[in-house]
C-alpha cells in the first residue's frame, strides 16, 4: 500500500530526495522509491549434479555392477572394504542424482553423511573422494535443513582441502559442493570463508583449468558474495575482487553472468562495499557490459551499476565519468521491459545527485525520459516519475523550468489515472513541488495553464474524493493552494475565475 511506511531495506539501494518536503510527503515518496523487480533473482542459488556418467574416473563396467538397495549401501559404507565404500557411495550418488524428487532425506536419515565426510579424506582413493563429494553436493543442493545436515557433520574443511587435489574432477566437485553450501545462507557462507576457501579458489583460477571448471569457480565466488545480514566481511571482499575483475574480462557468457551477479551482491552492501568495487578500475568494463545482448549478463550488470549510483555522489560521478549516462540512453530504448525498468531505476538514482550531475542527466537523457513517460509500460513509467521527482527536488531554477516545459506534463498528468496508486501519489507530489518552487511568476502561470490545458485540473479535482487518503489529501492540498482564489493573493485563479 502506498501509504504505508517504507521498511528501511526498501530504500537501501534507492537514492531519493525530499529534504525540502514535509515529513508526511517524504514518507509517501519513500514508500514508492524502490526498484520494483519484474522477476525473481535470475541467478541459480544452488545446482544439483544430475549427469550420471560424466566422469572419466568411473568406468561403464562398474555402472552395471551397482545394484545396491539402501540397506546394502548402509552395510557397505560401514564395512572396512574400500572397494565396497566406493561402490556403495556411487550407488548413493546414483540414487539422489535422478532428475525428479531425489530421496535426499533417505540418505540423511540413514546416517550416511558422517561416513561420506570421512570418505572425503581418503586421499589414496580419489574415485571415492569424487563420489562422496558428489553425494554431498547434491544433498547440499536441497533445503536449508538438508544443507545444514552436511555442514553439521564437518564437511566444509575436508571439501576445502580437496581444492588442492591433483585430480581436477575431485577439486571441481568440491568447488561445486562449497558453492551450494555458501549459497544457502550468510552463516554457511562465512563458514566457508573462515576456513580459508578463497585463496584456494583463486589458486585454481590461475592453473589454466577447463572452461566448465572455471564456470563452477565463478559461480561459487558469486555465492561467497551473496546473502546479507551480514554481508561478507570486507577482508573477504578485498580477497575476492582481484579474481572477479579478472573473470570480468573473460568472454564466456556464463562466467560473465556469475561475475556480474557477484558484483551486484557486493555493491548492494552500501558505500563501503561500493568503494571497494569502484576503486578496482572495473567501471569501464561494467559500462561496456550494460549493452550486452545476453540478458543473463546485462541484468546483473545493470543491478551493479544501479547500486553504484545509489552510493555517494563521488561514486556516482565515477560511473558517469566512465560513460554510464551515454550508454544508459541506449539501454533505456531496449525492447525488453525488464531492462528498461532497471535502466530507469538507475537513472532515478543519478537524478538524486547534486545539480551538476542532474545537469549531465538532463543533457543526455531528457528527451528519452519524456518519450518513456509517453510510450513505455507502466512499470517503466513508475521508475521515470521517480526520476522526475528526484530531479525536481534538487534542481536549480533553470533546471526546474527546463523540466517543467520539456514535454513531461501531458504524459505525467495522464498517469493520474494510472491503476498504480504509488504512481499517482508521486505525480501529485511532482505537480505540487513544481507549483511551489518555480519562483518566476510568468513561468508559474505558464505551468498552471499547461496543467489546465492537459486536463490536469479536472483530474486533480476528482482525486479529492479518492478512497486512498494520501491521494485525496494531496489533491485537496493542490486545489486549495494553487487552483482556488482565497483572497490572499497567493493562489492562481481557478477555472471560471479568470479576469
From Swiss-Prot:
Residues 1-57 form the IBB domain. It comes from the Eukaryota. The keyword Transport applies. GO terms for molecular function: nuclear import signal receptor activity. Disruption phenotype: Mutant mice exhibit abnormal preimplantation development. About half of the mutant embryos fail to develop into the blastocyst stage, or are delayed. Lethality is greater among female than among male embryos. GO terms for cellular component: cytosol; female germ cell nucleus; NLS-dependent protein nuclear import complex; nucleoplasm; nucleus; spindle. One of its GO terms (biological process) is blastocyst development. It is found in: Nucleus. Coiled coil: none annotated. Functions in nuclear protein import. Belongs to the importin alpha family. Binds to importin subunit beta-1/KPNB1 via the IBB domain; this complex dissociates in the presence of RAN-GTP. Shows a limited binding to the RB1 nuclear localization signal (NLS), but not to the SV40, nor NPM1 NLSs. Interacts with RSL1D1. This is Importin subunit alpha-8. It comes from Mus musculus (Mouse).
Amino acid at each position: 500500500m502506498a501509504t504505508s511506511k517504507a521498511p528501511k531495506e526498501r530504500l537501501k539501494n534507492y537514492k531519493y530526495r525530499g529534504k525540502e518536503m514535509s515529513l508526511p510527503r517524504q514518507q509517501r515518496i519513500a514508500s514508492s522509491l524502490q526498484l520494483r523487480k519484474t522477476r525473481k533473482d535470475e541467478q541459480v542459488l544452488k545446482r544439483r549434479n544430475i549427469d550420471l556418467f560424466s566422469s572419466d574416473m568411473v568406468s561403464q563396467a562398474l555402472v552395471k555392477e551397482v545394484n545396491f538397495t539402501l540397506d546394502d549401501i548402509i552395510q557397505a559404507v560401514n564395512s572396512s572394504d574400500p572397494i565396497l565404500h566406493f561402490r556403495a557411495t556411487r550407488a548413493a550418488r546414483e540414487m539422489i542424482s535422478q532428475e525428479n524428487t531425489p530421496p535426499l532425506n533417505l540418505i540423511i536419515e540413514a546416517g550416511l553423511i558422517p561416513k561420506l565426510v570421512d570418505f572425503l579424506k581418503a586421499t589414496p582413493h580419489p574415485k571415492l573422494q569424487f563420489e562422496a563429494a558428489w553425494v554431498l553436493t547434491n544433498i547440499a543442493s536441497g533445503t536449508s535443513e538438508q544443507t545444514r545436515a552436511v555442514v553439521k557433520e564437518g564437511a566444509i574443511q575436508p571439501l576445502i582441502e580437496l581444492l588442492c587435489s591433483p585430480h581436477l574432477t575431485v577439486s571441481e566437485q568440491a568447488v561445486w559442493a562449497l558453492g551450494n553450501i555458501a549459497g544457502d545462507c550468510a552463516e554457511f557462507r562465512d563458514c566457508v570463508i573462515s576456513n580459508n576457501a578463497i585463496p584456494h579458489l583463486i589458486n585454481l583460477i590461475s592453473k589454466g583449468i577447463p572452461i566448465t571448471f572455471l564456470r563452477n569457480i565463478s559461480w561459487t565466488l558469486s555465492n561467497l558474495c551473496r546473502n546479507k545480514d551480514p554481508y561478507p566481511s570486507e577482508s573477504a571482499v578485498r580477497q575476492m575482487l582481484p579474481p572477479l575483475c579478472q573473470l570480468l574480462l573473460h568472454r564466456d557468457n556464463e562466467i560473465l553472468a556469475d561475475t556480474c551477479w557477484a558484483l551486484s551482491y557486493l555493491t548492494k552492501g552500501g558505500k563501503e562495499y561500493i568503494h571497494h568495487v569502484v576503486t578496482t578500475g572495473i567501471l569501464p568494463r561494467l559500462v561496456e557490459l550494460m549493452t550486452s545482448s545476453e540478458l543473463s549478463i546485462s541484468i546483473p550488470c545493470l543491478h551493479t551499476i544501479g547500486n553504484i549510483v545509489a552510493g555517494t555522489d563521488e561514486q556516482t560521478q565515477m560511473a558517469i565519468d566512465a560513460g554510464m549516462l551515454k550508454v544508459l540512453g541506449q539501454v533505456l530504448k531496449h525492447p525488453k521491459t525488464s531492462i528498461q525498468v532497471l535502466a530507469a531505476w538507475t537513472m532515478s538514482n543519478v537524478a538524486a545527485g547534486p545539480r551538476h550531475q542532474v545537469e549531465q542527466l538532463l543533457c543526455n537523457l531528457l528527451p528519452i525520459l519524456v518519450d518513456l513517460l509517453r510510450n513505455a509500460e507502466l512499470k517503466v513509467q513508475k521508475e521515470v516519475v521517480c526520476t522526475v521527482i528526484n530531479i525536481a527536488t534538487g534542481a536549480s531554477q533553470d533546471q526546474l523550468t527546463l523540466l517543467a516545459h520539456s514535454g513531461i506534463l501531458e504524459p505525467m498528468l495522464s498517469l493520474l489515472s494510472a491503476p498504480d496508486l504509488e504512481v499517482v501519489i508521486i505525480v501529485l507530489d511532482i505537480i505540487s513541488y513544481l507549483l511551489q518552487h518555480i519562483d518566476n511568476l510568468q513561468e508559474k502561470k505558464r505551468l498552471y495553464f499547461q496543467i489546465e490545458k492537459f486536463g490536469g485540473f479536472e483530474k486533480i479535482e476528482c482525486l479529492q474524493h479518492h478512497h486512498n487518503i494520501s491521494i485525496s489529501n494531496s489533491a485537496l492540498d493542490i486545489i486549495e493552494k494553487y487552483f482556488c482564489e482565497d483572497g490572499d493573493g497567493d493562489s492562481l485563479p481557478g477555472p471560471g475565475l479568470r479576469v
